[in-house]
C-alpha cells in the first residue's frame, strides 16, 4: 500500500540513500531540506537537483534565524571544521545544539499537514558516539512523542539506525545509486576537502566497498 512519507533530505549520501529507499519501496515521497545557516550550503543545491531529476516534491525551509539563539558549532559559526578521522573528541565541535529535534519537529508538522504517516531520517550507527540526537534512545523517544503530539500519529523511521556508513553505501550501490549526486564535506568550498571528519568517513566507506568516490577532492 502506497503511503505518504516525508524524508528529511540534506543532500548528503545517507539521506540520499534513505530518499531512494523510500521511493523504491513505492511510497509517495515529499523531501524536506533545511537551511540552518550551515557553511556547507552546497548540499542544498545538490538536494534540489536530485529532487528535480527524480520528480520528487521538495521544499527547502530557511530556519537560519535559530542561530540568533543557538551557537557554538563549527558548521554554523566562525570556528574551524576539525580535520582527521571521524572521532568523538574532534567532531564534538560540529554539533549544532538540538538540531535534529528541531528538524524532526518541523518535519512532523509538515507530515501532519500532508496526512503523511512517517518521517524518514538518516541517522546511522557511526553517529551514535558523537551526536546524541542520532542515538537509538533519542530516535525511540522522539518517535514516542510524535505518535502522541498530534491527533494524527506520525512515526519517526530511521532505516539505517543500526548500520554504518559503509553499510549504507553497500545498500545504495545494490540499489544502483549514483553518489556523484551527493555532498558530504563540512567545509563550504567548491570541492570536497578530503580532510574533515565527514570526508574521511565517506572515503573510508568507498575504500571498504572497493570503490572510487566519484566526487572531486582538493
Curated annotation (Swiss-Prot):
User: What are the alphabetically sorted keywords of the record?
Assistant: ATP-binding, Ligase, Metal-binding, Nucleotide-binding, Queuosine biosynthesis, Zinc
Which chemical reaction does it catalyze? 7-carboxy-7-deazaguanine + NH4(+) + ATP = 7-cyano-7-deazaguanine + ADP + phosphate + H2O + H(+)
The EC number(s) this enzyme carries: 6.3.4.20
Residues that bind Zn(2+): 185, 193, 196, 199
Pfam families the UniProt entry points to: QueC (PF06508)
Q: Per its UniProt entry, what is the enzyme's top EC class, as one word? A: ligase
Might you name a Gene Ontology BP term for this protein? queuosine biosynthetic process
InterPro entries linked: QueC, Rossmann-like_a/b/a_fold
Cofactor(s) named in the record? Zn(2+)
A molecular function (GO) held by this record is: ligase activity, forming carbon-nitrogen bonds
Answer whether the UniProt record assigns the keyword Transcription to this protein. Answer: no
What does the entry list as the binding residues for ATP?
9-19
Q: What does this protein do?
A: Catalyzes the ATP-dependent conversion of 7-carboxy-7-deazaguanine (CDG) to 7-cyano-7-deazaguanine (preQ(0)).
Q: Which family does it belong to?
A: Belongs to the QueC family.
- Name recorded for this polypeptide: 7-cyano-7-deazaguanine synthase
Q: What is the lineage of its organism?
A: Bacteria, Pseudomonadati, Pseudomonadota, Gammaproteobacteria, Alteromonadales
